[in-house]
């Protein structure tokens, strides 16, 4: 009689810090396929919503060049979109934790809300309706998709969190590129309705379908080919331990928000997001104001978006080797220098340099999102990482108001270069703030008297 191979037993183990892991199940046993498919579905969903943020500036510039119109009101529509997108992240994480909101339900619901944005601006010129459809509904939908996809990937790749979260969040930039090219090539006031309707339908279908296929692993799941107890202490197995910290204990969101480290992360997120969003939205407008062509503006934003996307994954990998805080400091310094370079190349009518500095700004301007997400897990622990990062990520809403809303007030007066100079300075200030990041839970030791 032949013996049948029985599945590996599921066991719960604890590391030296008391964190528990569920070990013994492979993804094929749980969902019938490799976890790579969960990464792919999340990447596709994120890629399709990127146009809502990264394509807005080019679409607005293309319509303004071909038909004129008021830029200030339209820019505030996007600023408010960022407010609702960032504000939706923390509630989504809470709903997922407390009410077991599955990604296969959350992402399709978010897809329907996301599609309301382009569908609304396709069918109306009314400012209040645009705010309701694009800023509120589409913003909330994008926040739901972003928070859910990021958390799902982090749960499937607990041993590669930084790199995989960087990869999936980077899809937002990469996925916007075809839409940026489309807007720069054919978008005019005459075909606006048809173009935006098509964008909305594609977004609804693709994001909903990809999201419906997403599943979470069991709570505390860990890949069976790695011993989590060794992973927690062995620097040859887990190379990120050499230059990164591990949490003293596991912090709930209510505990994390009371620590100095949370406050510093929140301030860095506000400043970094404001500077990054300024570049994403205003690079095409700055290009046109300085006499460059719409084609050059689109190339600059396209490069920015691609490098922004790929740079997030690269930053995650580098942070494993060099340290999260050190990599974050470098990214913020590069962002500040790149924004200074944008002003120099724009005022000097240097188109190639302008596109290059836009790409460099994108590289740094996307890196801080996965880096801060990884720092949250390093400082406050893995079990509540999604909810804790959602709380930090909400700082982006203030970044949207500062980085998009305030410059909209001076866009008509041709003072955009001044806004970029201010952004450069505050990016450097944010880099200095990283020196104040310290792992919570350590005793305060003073000098002897």
Model-derived regions: residue spans:
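Helix-loop-helix hairpin linking two adjacent transmembrane segments in secondary transporters
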Residues: 172-225
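Extracytoplasmic gate region of multi-pass secondary transporters
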Residues: 56-63, 254-313
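A membrane-interface helix-boundary motif in multi-pass transporters
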Residues: 185-201, 409-426
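C-terminal transmembrane helical hairpin of 12-TM major facilitator-type secondary transporters
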Residues: 290, 296, 302-308, 312-314, ...
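Intracellular juxtamembrane helix-capping segments at the cytosolic ends
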Residues: 143-157, 164, 367-380
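Helix-to-loop junctions at the C-terminal end of transmembrane segments
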Residues: 88-101, 312-323, 411
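Hydrophobic core of transmembrane alpha-helices in multi-pass small-molecule transporters
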Residues: 117, 129-144, 270, 353-367
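A late C-terminal transmembrane helix in Major Facilitator Superfamily
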Residues: 176, 379-414
């Amino acid at each position: 009689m032949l013996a049948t191979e029985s599945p590996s037993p599921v066991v719960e183990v604890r590391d030296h810090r008391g964190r528990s892991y569920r070990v013994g199940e492979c993804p094929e046993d749980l969902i019938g396929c490799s976890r790579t498919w969960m990464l792919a579905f999340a990447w596709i969903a994120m890629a399709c919503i990127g146009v809502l943020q990264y394509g807005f500036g080019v679409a607005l510039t293309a319509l303004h060049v071909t038909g004129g119109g008021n830029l200030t009101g339209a820019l505030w529509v996007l600023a408010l979109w960022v407010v609702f997108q960032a504000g939706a992240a923390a509630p989504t994480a809470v709903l997922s934790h407390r009410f077991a909101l599955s990604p296969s339900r959350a992402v399709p619901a978010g897809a329907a809300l996301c599609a309301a944005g382009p569908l609304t601006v396709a069918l109306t010129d009314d400012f209040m309706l645009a705010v309701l459809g694009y800023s509120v509904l589409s913003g909330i939908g994008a926040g739901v998709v972003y928070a859910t996809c990021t958390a799902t990937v982090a749960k499937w790749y607990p041993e590669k969190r930084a790199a995989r979260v960087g990869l999936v969040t980077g899809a937002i930039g990469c996925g916007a590129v075809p839409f940026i090219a489309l807007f720069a090539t054919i978008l005019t006031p005459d075909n606006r309705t048809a173009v935006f309707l098509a964008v909305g339908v594609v977004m609804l279908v693709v994001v909903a379908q990809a999201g419906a296929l997403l599943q979470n692993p069991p709570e505390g799941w860990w890949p069976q080919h790695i011993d989590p107890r060794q992973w927690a202490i062995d620097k040859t197995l887990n190379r990120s331990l050499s230059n990164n910290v591990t949490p003293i204990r596991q912090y709930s969101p209510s505990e994390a928000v009371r620590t100095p480290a949370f406050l510093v992360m929140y301030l860095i997120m506000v400043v970094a997001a404001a500077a990054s969003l300024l570049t994403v939205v205003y690079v095409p407008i700055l290009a046109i104001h300085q006499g460059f062509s719409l084609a050059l503006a689109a190339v600059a934003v396209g490069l920015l978006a691609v490098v922004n996307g790929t740079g997030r994954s690269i930053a995650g990998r580098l942070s494993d080797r060099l340290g999260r805080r050190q990599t974050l400091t470098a990214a913020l310094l590069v962002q500040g220098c790149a924004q200074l370079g944008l002003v120099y190349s724009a005022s000097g009518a240097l188109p190639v340099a302008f596109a290059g500095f836009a790409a460099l700004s994108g590289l740094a301007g996307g890196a801080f999102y996965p880096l801060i997400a990884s720092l949250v897990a390093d400082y406050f622990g893995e079990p509540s990482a999604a909810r804790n990062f959602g709380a930090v990520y909400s700082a982006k809403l203030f970044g949207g108001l500062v980085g998009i809303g305030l410059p909209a007030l001076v866009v008509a007066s041709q003072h955009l270069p001044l806004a970029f100079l201010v952004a450069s300075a505050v990016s450097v200030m944010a880099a200095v703030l990283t020196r104040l990041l310290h792992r919570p839970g350590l005793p305060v030791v003073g000098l002897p008297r």
